[in-house]
């Protein structure tokens, strides 16, 4: 779809347990006959492959048992006439604007993403750490110091990752909290249903502007 002129597509994805549901509208010639293979390959690409399933078993989504529900239809002619000529569409509203700081986003979000990326790459080579990682950074506005670094990362067995957190951030936070609720083993869509729009809104600016 990315390389086909004139194609419009608005597709949402919802994942729960081992079920992936695709819903939305498409205008143009798009071959969706092998959509199940595409979905499974996308899961493998982000790390949820057969090897991962062998390690985590029932704790995470299993690419070998994926059910794909395809509810992608044809774009409404009423909507298309506005999109085609005037650019109208129902795309929702996201908050956020460029600000002074790394990557033109607020420093807390930048550091949280940096830490998340580092942990994700580390987890991909680990037989104990999972890929469903959440991070949050709190900064003292007066000093710029990191007050708290919070990490939620699946672990089959307890593991001290605080030294890795410090190394990834390049500084020692006053407090590091890892899996503060206790055990974190069930993860991915097995534990938390994911919907495209909700996840994107959180990823852009965490619904708040600096």
Where are these regions (language model features)?
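Conserved mixed alpha/beta catalytic, RNA-binding, or beta-rich assembly cores of soluble enzyme
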Residues: 93, 166, 184-189, 193-210
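Glycine-rich, mobile lid/loop segments that gate access to catalytic sites or pores
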Residues: 9, 17-20, 30, 37, ...
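Cofactor-binding beta-sheet edge motifs in enzyme active sites
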Residues: 13
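Short, surface-exposed beta-strand-loop junctions and turns on beta-sheet-rich folds
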Residues: 28-29, 208
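Catalytic palm subdomain of template-directed nucleic-acid polymerases
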Residues: 23-26
